[in-house]
Amino acid sequence: MLFTYNKNPQYDSILMYAASNGYDKIVKLILDKVGTSFKEHIHETILLWAFQNEHYETIQLLIDHGFNKLVISNLLTNKNQFDVSNKYLIYFMADEEYYYQVRENIRNDQRVSTIKNTYRI
């Protein structure tokens, strides 16, 4: 897939396209081969596209490669920008065992009443 000829105006890069569509294998391949030496605003944009489209595994993959998960936390404090619920913040704030329980609840669109206030960085 080359995006240099008929560039999609919604995406600045193939990484942004792959992240926003949840193509985890492509995201991992790009990050492993190219690295993450992008400008900070591009990091934020790629992470936000994945978040807005609810690709949680892709988000975790980006975070594991150095993308800043506080971008999502900051996004959730500004609800005018995107209509999201606090339940998605839990994904980034939970320990591993709690994360799997919460992720299952999110997939089933169930509300989670408790939030752990510790970041795993």
UniProtKB/Swiss-Prot annotation:
Entry-linked Gene3D superfamilies: Ankyrin repeat-containing domain
ANK repeats: 10-40, 42-71
Keywords, in A-Z order: ANK repeat, Repeat
InterPro entries, alphabetized: Ankyrin_rpt, Ankyrin_rpt-contain_sf
Keyword Repeat: yes
Keyword Repeat belongs to the record: yes
Database matches in Pfam families: Ank_2
Domain of life: Viruses
Protein name: Putative ankyrin repeat protein L215
Native species: Acanthamoeba polyphaga mimivirus
